[in-house]
Regions:
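Compositionally biased terminal segments of proteins
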Residues: 1-163
Length: 163
């Protein structure tokens, strides 16, 4: 156990956390797309991240499926999430052993818009992971936060990486 979890704090997620979470989400039939720092990393750009960011379809049924999957985390922090929270708030932060941010919309793009706008499925350790395409990630970075500056400056790198 690392120092953060010894103090009851969340630790930075690692790739195996992402794989485990996506395995659980898939088992529950949850509709989600990986966005944010891990998505950027999977496209080949170096980026640190403190959370796993998921764009989720915001229906009550799907949020319940997401919560069941998040219930595999040790502190069961997802039990505190109401079914309508993803529709009511910009970001729903589930701070368990790791932090998972749930978004119903990202820069005006909801789950259906993401599916239409470009999602690819990557297999990680045998687990299919729906991942925002490079183009979709750039569209989602239309708003600039301080921690996004390296990604925003590197947005042209996505264009150069296109197949």
């Amino acid at each position: 156990m690392d120092d953060a979890t010894d103090r009851g704090e969340s630790r930075a997620p690692e790739l195996e956390d992402l794989v485990s979470l996506c395995r659980a989400l898939n088992a529950e039939g949850a509709r989600y797309v990986l966005i944010g720092g891990f998505a950027v990393l999977l496209h080949g750009l170096v980026r640190t991240t403190k959370a796993i960011d998921l764009l989720v379809e915001a229906s009550d049924e799907n949020v319940r499926a997401v919560k069941r999957a998040l219930g595999t985390l040790p502190d069961n922090a997802a039990a505190q999430v109401a079914d309508d929270d993803v529709r009511s708030y910009t970001v729903v932060r589930v701070a368990d052993e790791i932090v998972v941010d749930l978004l119903g919309r990202a820069c005006g793009i909801d789950y259906d818009g993401a599916i239409e706008g470009g999602v690819e499925v990557r297999e990680l350790e045998g687990v299919p992971v729906p991942l925002a395409s490079k183009e979709l990630l750039v569209r989602m970075k239309d708003t600039v936060r301080e921690n996004d500056l390296p990604v925003t400056v590197s947005a042209g790198a996505f264009s150069r990486m296109r197949r």
